Amino acid sequence: VHPRPYLVCFNHCEHVTLENVTLTNSPAWTVHPLYCRNVVIRGLNIKNPADSPNTDGIDPDGCQDVRIHDCTIDVGDDCIAIKSGTEDTPNRQGCERLIISNCHFLHGHGVVLGSEMSGGIRNVVVSACVFYETDRGIRLKTRRGRGGTVEGIQLNNLVMEKVMCPFVFNMYYFCGANGKMKHVWDKAPY
């Protein structure tokens, strides 16, 4: 079985600019910078069906120095998901120094940290963004074993209208092949 492909993926790239394009109907994550440095994503219009799971808008993963601005994202899953690998990822590279500004998020899950965060997520600024009818605004999701730390997150001048849960923190996020894993009864961190 082959997983659905990403629409756009940059792997181990430096000095990437993706701007002023419309991306629609992605089979999986729409834009996936992986282990990249100095990435600028601006002026994107991303539209995926509201009932399409795992069709995230932009998912920087293990990246440094990323600027995402002036984008409109309307998807069936995470609008932006900041990631840094799972517990099985051999290269646990942190995702750090991200600026997300002047974006509009429609429907979907807003701006998400995780659930893949074994390398840590550091120094993220989300500012001057509008969330309209998203089911979440800012969401942190992880689970035991993922490891990693989250630090230096700044949220400034955000507008959330008709957002079901503006802030969600889930430390027992279920994931796996069928979307569920056995519940953990032991509350020890590792």
Which sequence ranges carry the predicted segments?
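Extracellular/periplasmic carbohydrate-active domains that bind, remodel
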Residues: 1-190
